[in-house]
Amino acid sequence: MGNAFNVRWQRLAGTDANIRYYNLPADITYFFQGAPQDTSALYVISSPDELAEIKGYLDTSNPNVRIYASSRSNAASNTPEYYAKMNGVQFSDIPFFKQSDSSQYQKVAGSTGGEFQLMRLYAMGSDAWLLINHFNELRQVPGYTLSGLTGQLSADSNCDVDRDMTWYQVQDGNVVAVAN
């Protein structure tokens, strides 16, 4: 995953990403010791508990560093108290979670016990079905896109599927979608 992130970063920024791996959230403290003072952001792949620990450290030592996280940190078990501590954190996840009032969301949440990992799996299966039923259009019509439960879906000339996810931000303890 680090290599794919760096390749994309190089395309967008023209420089290498400063990628570091950690085993424990406490290891993050060492990354910022001796790091360039212009470090402005951190992208983490972590559990909610690990993210809370990392956020706590950065709030006291590097409060200007913006935190971006993967969907792994977004769990159904996250409490209002958790979100109150996560103010400013942005994370990517599927747009299906914006549709919590829809009947489809309610049905899936009910059958999965509201477990986000299972709901993501359902969304991937739904999108696979959508892609199968629109394969010819994806293959033959340049720029053709589909609105799936996991994001905007498109395919390149090799039929490699690309997906744009939704970004969310915690603002005053509430999770809100960020305009892409």
Residues of each region from the PLM?
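Active-site proximal loops enriched in glycine and acidic residues that flank catalytic Cys/His/Asp
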Residues: S46, A69-R72, D93, Q169-Q171, ...
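Segments of small-molecule ligand-sensing domains
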Residues: G110-A179
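Extracellular/periplasmic periplasmic-binding protein-like sensory domains
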Residues: R11-N18, P36-T39, K55-S126, N136, ...
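Short, solvent-exposed coil/turn elements at secondary-structure transition points
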Residues: N23-D27, S73, P95, G173
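Generic recognition of flexible, low-complexity loop/linker segments
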Residues: F32, A41, K55-Y57, L153-A155
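Extracellular/periplasmic Venus flytrap/periplasmic-binding protein
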Residues: M1-E50
